[in-house]
Amino acid sequence: ADNQHPTVYQKVASQMHLSSSLSQDVHARYGGIQRPALSQRRFPYGNYSNAGLQTCQATQDLSLIAANASPVFVQAPQEKGLAAFATDFLMGGVSAAVSKTAAAPIERVKLLIQNQDEMIKAGRLSEPYKGIGDCFSRTIKDEGFAALWRGNTANVIRYFPTQALNFAFKDYFKRLFNFKKDRDGYWKWFAGNLASGGGAGASSLLFVYSLDYARTRLANDAKAAKKGGGGRQFDGLVDVYRKTLKSDGVAGLYRGFNISCVGIIVYRGLYFGMYDSLKPVLLTGKMEDSFFASFALGWLITNGAGLASYPIDTVRRRMMMTSGEAVKYKSSFDAFNQILKNEGPKSLFKGAGANVLRAVAGAGVLAGYDKLQVIVFGKKYGSGGG
């Protein structure tokens, strides 16, 4: 059974949100892609290889964008039978729910810090957060400990449609952009990766984007605010949909969608560009066979690409926050310019530190859950990305 299922390292590598984790989430998270050569050689782990590099590739989940483009480790029904597929699909859902729920407090803090300026402008936050610790303590003090999981339900729910959509789209885009690096050359392969990742990611994103919108609005619905007399703006997931549709229509649920699609391509371009530039330089000789060297390289590349593309995640979420408000950004470009002009470049990276912590927490819990599956069921089941 172990040869048919990835180890925890590969499963963590495919996660995210991490993911989105712009994920958020990512490398091989985009359906139908050719993985870099290093991740396919030298380290035998069943049908997967080089666990070190793949593990750290998972640690940056830039939320829905990366997560929606993740490949599906539970195989399609025609490949292994409906019963086995259903079992893996459901167990993957439990795995995703466990890892997302464990990391939810850090994820909410990340979103609060990232979007605090929009909340202040809307009168829904009294004063800025001084950092991760201050955000944690104020949230617990004002809303209670359980409030750290606000918005997590929507985040868990979207796993299932995301996985189903990945089944529908990944094979199509794989056939459409099936370039090989050794056969077609680097640039065709590189462009094919961007196109297939962007196409598959955007297609899935179209169907589940509103859930990430709802999750973002719920997570940023701080209780202690001047507006509303200290009450909440939304009563729950359904209320987010109801109020947004009433005030902004369907467009309100998709605010920031275009820049989210761009983010998929930007992250992939940064990831593969950094990988092909650094791998031949750093992983040479004995280092090529080193698990820890490949782990370090994967960590460096994933977090480097994630940090460089983080402003896109900030812009899209800041745009989400304007649905239902009187003043909105005219476009993602307008949002980017206004944030830079009024708040400075640092504002585009607010919450990035918490995002890295969230990825580590999610990966650690997933590792423990994988061990539990082996103890209880005697095998490892497919893990859910997204």
UniProtKB/Swiss-Prot annotation:
InterPro entries for the chain: ADT_euk_type, Mit_carrier, Mitochondrial_sb/sol_carrier, Mt_carrier_dom_sf
Any single GO CC term annotated in Swiss-Prot or TrEMBL for this entry: mitochondrial inner membrane
Reactions it catalyzes: ADP(in) + ATP(out) = ADP(out) + ATP(in)
Keyword Transcription part of the UniProt annotation: no
An annotated Gene Ontology molecular function: ATP:ADP antiporter activity
Motif Nucleotide carrier signature motif, residue range(s) on this chain: 316-321
Repeat region (Solcar), residues: 83-176, 188-281, 289-375
Activity regulation as described: The matrix-open state (m-state) is inhibited by the membrane-permeable bongkrekic acid (BKA). The cytoplasmic-open state (c-state) is inhibited by the membrane-impermeable toxic inhibitor carboxyatractyloside (CATR).
Residues the entry annotates as binding ADP: 158, 170, 316
Span of chain positions assigned to the transit peptide in the UniProt entry: 1-76
Membrane-spanning parts: 85-112, 153-177, 186-206, 257-278, 292-312, 352-372
Signal peptide start and end residues: none
Region (Important for transport activity): 316-321
Gene Ontology biological-process entries: mitochondrial ADP transmembrane transport; mitochondrial ATP transmembrane transport
Membrane topology term: Multi-pass membrane protein
Stated family: Belongs to the mitochondrial carrier (TC 2.A.29) family.
Written domain comment of the UniProt record: The transmembrane helices are not perpendicular to the plane of the membrane, but cross the membrane at an angle. At least 2 of the odd-numbered transmembrane helices exhibit a sharp kink, due to the presence of a conserved proline residue.
Protein name as it appears in the record: ADP,ATP carrier protein, mitochondrial
The species this protein was found in: Solanum tuberosum (Potato)
Lineage: Eukaryota, Viridiplantae, Streptophyta, Embryophyta, Tracheophyta
Name of the gene encoding the protein in the UniProt record: ANT1
